[in-house]
Amino acid sequence: MSRLRLGLQRDWLTSVDSAMIPMSACTRRPTFDRLSAPWTNQAVGRRGSRAKTAEVAVRVLEEDIVIVGAGVVGLTSALTLQRLGRSVVVLDPSPPGSGASFGNAGTIADFAIAPVGSPALLKQLPSLLFDRQGPFSIRQGAMAALLPWLAQFAWQSLPAYSANNMRAIAALTLDAGARWQGLAADLEAGHLIQNKGCLYVFNNEARYQAGRRDMRLRQALGVNIELLNPGELAQLEPHLPQVEGGGAFFPDALSVSDPGHLVGLIAARAEADGVQIVPESVVRLSAQKRQVVLQLGNGQRVTARQVVIAAGAHSKFLADQVGDLVPLETERGYHLEYDGESDRVRRPVCAAESGFYMSPMAGRLRVAGTVELGGVKAPPTPDRLAFLSHRMRDIFPDLKAASRSWLGFRPSMPDSRPVISESRVGRQIIYAFGHGHIGLTLAPMTASLVAALVQSTAPEVPLTDYRVNRF
């Protein structure tokens, strides 16, 4: 069997910092943005144009398993499959873990079972969509393209559907902490995993009572929650301003002090175990009876027995090519970082009414979150970053300006459930995308389910709720 010999060996443990967008870049297109199909990356410099493809002599290489996407889901799947005796190649034009896997809030959130769409959100949706200063917004230029997705999102926000979606998500999340602790021990990365829980803060009594209703639903599905009054909240987080509402503490939740470094360790271990990580794009995908053919941005053609699509927000481009017209959209996620401010909070704290986390990380405080619908092509929205900055000044008036900012892309399904499924063409193509806000949380479980699909063994949970053709 031939092996791909395309890429330079990289230091996966340090390269992810290049994905940061400086504050001065907030009004221009980020250089790491994968701007259009073909699925490529400007910084890597490979663009799968027809002109370039025509200039390169096509070579056909044969592989066992190709995983498209070197985020945390793709890499944990690669590591799992390689250890099952399969031969795995990972393709991604960007450095491993440099997308949403890098820029998230760092929570391993067994409690994060509530879908984005809910009856409460549905009531507020018309006003939220046009509020550039709120926690849920939409880029106006993307409205027409988003209408079909928004219609499905609204439908999935109805009470019965929202409840079913919560149950489906809970089936994947409730042992997330134990899975990550096992993986971290294997990676000798236990020092990156913090066991201090996570906290929701409600700033007034009305929001606290609404939050209590949500927490009861989560408790019914097995989430361990402690409801706090303002005094108890102040004991846990003494540097936060006093609130009139209360809090919800999730004692079993874990957090990661440096998500980018953790994913880099997974990549390094995968390579040490024999996985080949190749910095290349996939521009075309076609399924045949016993194999899948991938055309790469450099003109090479690869055939594989099986392909796993784990390309996050960029997965739709490839799924569409084999007839799986999945309703995947992009939530544009932002973060700000404040160097030297990690002591402001002791654990990840979510300002519930604003939809963002304050997460203490190695040498810095990361403020991450909110939802902006609008695709991967547009530059960062200054209003989104200003929203985070202003809210942080409300909480900590003495806080200095942010050290840096970042924009990344979450893969979002209308029902907030991931797609973990065979393709319509069969087991030659497996999907593992659409994890929304909880890709980090669900990566080890998803890897186990991907392995079951690839190997035709019984999955740990039934996969009907996550099939690609459920819409």
Whereabouts are the PLM-identified features?
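A conserved short coil-to-beta-strand element within the FAD-binding core of flavoproteins
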Residues: 230-232, 236, 278-292
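C-terminal catalytic lobe of FAD-dependent flavoproteins
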Residues: 353, 394, 398-471
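Core beta-strand elements of the Rossmann-like FAD/NAD(P) dinucleotide-binding domain
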Residues: 61-63, 297-306
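Rossmann-like flavin
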Residues: 147-265
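Active-site substrate-recognition segment that forms the wall
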Residues: 106-107, 112, 116-156, 284-287, ...
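N-terminal Rossmann-like FAD-binding beta1-loop-alpha1 element of flavoenzymes
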Residues: 64-89
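Low-acidity, Ser/Thr- and Arg-rich intrinsically disordered low-complexity segments
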Residues: 2-5, 10-18, 24-29, 34-39, ...
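Glycine-rich FAD pyrophosphate-binding loop
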Residues: 83-102
